[in-house]
Swiss-Prot record:
Annotated protein name in UniProt: Large ribosomal subunit protein uL23
PANTHER family: 60S RIBOSOMAL PROTEIN L23A
Oligomeric and partner information: Part of the 50S ribosomal subunit. Contacts protein L29, and trigger factor when it is bound to the ribosome.
A GO MF term: rRNA binding
Role this protein plays: One of the early assembly proteins it binds 23S rRNA. One of the proteins that surrounds the polypeptide exit tunnel on the outside of the ribosome. Forms the main docking site for trigger factor binding to the ribosome.
Gene name as annotated: rplW
InterPro entries to which the protein is assigned, alphabetical: Nucleotide-bd_a/b_plait_sf (IPR012677), Ribosomal_uL23-like (IPR013025), Ribosomal_uL23/eL15/eS24_sf (IPR012678)
Amino acid sequence: MSAYKYYDLIRKPIITEKTTTLSEQNKYAFYVDKFAEKLTLKKAIEEIFKVKVKKVNILNVKGKKKRFKGIIGTQINRKKAIVTLEKDHNIDFAGGIK
């Protein structure tokens, strides 16, 4: 699979307080394509970030119901992947920002 297809699998990284504490354990969270599978995600992360992946966990996140100006709507359903890296590898999302 080409690198362009790998970039289509990973939507965006999830950067919250909870995932920041997970990154200390070499675990990183991403929103991924709803048809993504564990093996293809493992190859995509290794190819894009040049790291060694130990394990990939995937979960489906159901969209919440929200009210906006009296109209009830739902957020989109998403798929989330939590990627565990090998011991000496890490991903730097900040990119050297000071």
